Amino acid sequence: MSRPPLILTSTMNATKGAEFSDDSTSLSHWYTRALAKARGAPVLMPNLADKKLIQSMVERCDGVMLTGGDDLHPDLYDPQLPKKIKATAGGIDADRDLSEFLLIEQALQQHKPLLAICRGPQVLNVALGGGLITDIPLERPGSLDHRRKAQAHRLTQTIAIESGSLMHKIFRTRSMKINSGHHQAVGDLAPMLRATARTSDGIVEAIELNKAEAKNSPFHLGMQFHPERLWERYPEFLKPFRAFIKACRP
């Protein structure tokens, strides 16, 4: 039996660890359980912002997953952002921001499959030259309520999926219901990326590489919603993890 693909997984720095009350590497078990269920083996990456270390870790792993968490530093995508909007960005972690930028760089250079969730597609877009909507309620008044963390395990919104996209191939539908738990979203798209799913108010819910870029890296998918919190109740949401692991098989 072949070994399970090793998936280098981004993490967040929790302020209180289980052993001592200091910074600790942290990751929700929903991510690791979804990867394991899809027959992948998660490898947690510390946020050390060390380019040589990250390069080596990507070389040894078969795929990369960017996970959710707090907000990117606004200066990374809009240094001129008004103070009122900038103040809505919370939980800034410069080490994580830089570590994930380096991780994305190496995943692309080494042509490794990449799956990005929640914060993940936002980081991917900014790292490749795109922008963010820093706070949907302030910058897109009248939009749907996207911050429904209390309903993270339920289907609350509907997305339209672009025909022929990787999202379409995975879920085999042009429309589906998802969960939602975010106040930020992908803004201006990076030149290498395209939006392949949106809610009815135009908010981007999935991004992929442009067709020309995808020839070198066929599996790069970012989902703003949280499939890892849905698959136990709605089995179809395990599909992106299975497709990702299949793309990662050595």
Which residue ranges define each predicted feature?
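Active-site-proximal beta-strand elements of phosphoester/diester hydrolases
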Residues: 221-224
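Extended polybasic, low-complexity segments that bind anionic RNA or targeting/receptor surfaces
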Residues: 179
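N-terminal beta1-alpha1 cap of cysteine-dependent amidohydrolase-like domains
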Residues: 1-115, 126-133, 137-170, 175, ...
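Short, positively charged patches
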Residues: 218
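Glycine-rich beta-to-alpha active-site loop
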Residues: 116, 121
